[in-house]
Amino acid sequence: MANNNNIPHDSISDPSPTDDFFEQILGLSNFSGSSGSGLSGIGGVGPPPMMLQLGSGNEGNHNHMGAIGGGGPVGFHNQMFPLGLSLDQGKGHGFLKPDETGKRFQDDVLDNRCSSMKPIFHGQPMSQPAPPMPHQQSTIRPRVRARRGQATDPHSIAERLRRERIAERIRSLQELVPTVNKTDRAAMIDEIVDYVKFLRLQVKVLSMSRLGGAGAVAPLVTEMPLSSSVEDETQAVWEKWSNDGTERQVAKLMEENVGAAMQLLQSKALCIMPISLAMAIYHSQPPDTSSSIVKPEMNPPP
């Protein structure tokens, strides 16, 4: 080792990575050829000790090899066991060059290992990706809305009972007023209200006529003209209605359908009352002079 330090640095030529690569391949082939003969003559002997190549940067210094871990068999004494790692002592006074050492390690070791591992990976079939798992149904079930009539909430039960009571009352009103509109609930209620008002008026008129208060009944009767002029003649209104068949129509409807008769009278602003009461109301009213016909004066001839 001391002699190597005295050698000038200019005289040492660094071997190229290609030369080291071929030297390691040749050393590996020599070792494999001689290891069979060495191991065949020795029985029960353990594996040979690993050798470490200490190169000084000169080809003549590769023969200086030392055994690591003590002496070994004779067959392995002069053989070189390449590790793929060489310690160059040629330059730097016994220290390694980081750039050259790393380059040699990458070229020798990594390339050899990668080339040896390629057939293994290329020989095996590629693993197929696992098929996607079907979408698992969530354990939480969506909230199902209760059907009508099966609610358990107290507020919902009370609301359902209220709707049932309203429907029963409307059916009862439909029975009282047969001719009412049953398709539209709002229109049906309006017709029922008008019908009730008409009945209240009839009750007042009939009750007061029995008590003899004809004068008090008159303001309750719907205002209507008591006379009209037809061809220069004064005629009572009820006489006209009697002549045009209104009375007979109302009498017929009273026998068949009372509700229809009430609606007909209401449309004509009439109400039912005894004849005696009607005559009393008529005689109690003063004669209407405003309805008399005033004939225009005739211009005298010139």
Curated annotation (Swiss-Prot):
- SMART domains cross-referenced by the UniProt entry: HLH
Q: In which tissues is it expressed?
A: Expressed constitutively in roots, leaves, stems and flowers.
Q: Entry's InterPro entries? A: bHLH_dom (IPR011598), HLH_DNA-bd_sf (IPR036638), IND-like (IPR045843)
One Pfam family, short name: HLH
Q: What is its main location?
A: nucleus
- A Gene Ontology CC term for this entry? nucleus
**Where are the stretches annotated Disordered?**
124-154
Q: Give compartment(s).
A: Nucleus
Q: Which UniProt keywords apply?
A: DNA-binding, Nucleus, Transcription, Transcription regulation
Q: Which SUPFAM superfamilies match?
A: HLH, helix-loop-helix DNA-binding domain (SSF47459)
One GO molecular-function entry: DNA binding
Give start and end of each bHLH domain. Answer: 150-199
Lineage, top-rank taxon, reads Eukaryota
Can you state the subunit structure given in the record? Homodimer.
Name of the featured protein: Transcription factor bHLH7
State the encoding gene.
BHLH7
